[in-house]
Amino acid sequence: MIVLAIRPDSWNFPLLLHVASAMLLVAAAVVAAVALTQALRTSEPGGAAALQRFGARTLLWVAVPMAVVLNVDAEWIRSKEFPSGSSDPAWIGWGYGTAESSLIFLVIATILASLAVRRSRAGLGIGKLSKAATGLSLLSIAILLIAIWAMTTKPS
């Protein structure tokens, strides 16, 4: 058991970027999920379309880029903390698995939400595409919560 671990100063910036991108990713996923959920629950067509558009844009402009930055930063800090040739602890695998799967789900949710926005502009309503995008964004939040657990508890 490690009681105190002091990192070299050269690790601080990549770790700060990794943690900041993770926090922004979770925040963007939650904001998008709330907007998409409210779009489904709103009875006014104009309000539902605006919420749907906001949720899709939040996914596109914030969540997906932060997921990419998170993965790049994770590799950067892993290369410093665990150089090639050393074995990675189990929590690193949990982190990669959850980060990559949440990125995939967020990209699919972004595509579906954007298609739902396009359908609503054509007057076809939001429909099943929006429900699927909402479900995938909620699933990605659950996966990101697992990642937060793995990164804070660091199970072996």
Report each predicted region and the residues it spans.
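Polytopic transmembrane helical bundles with strong interfacial aromatic enrichment
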Residues: M1-S156
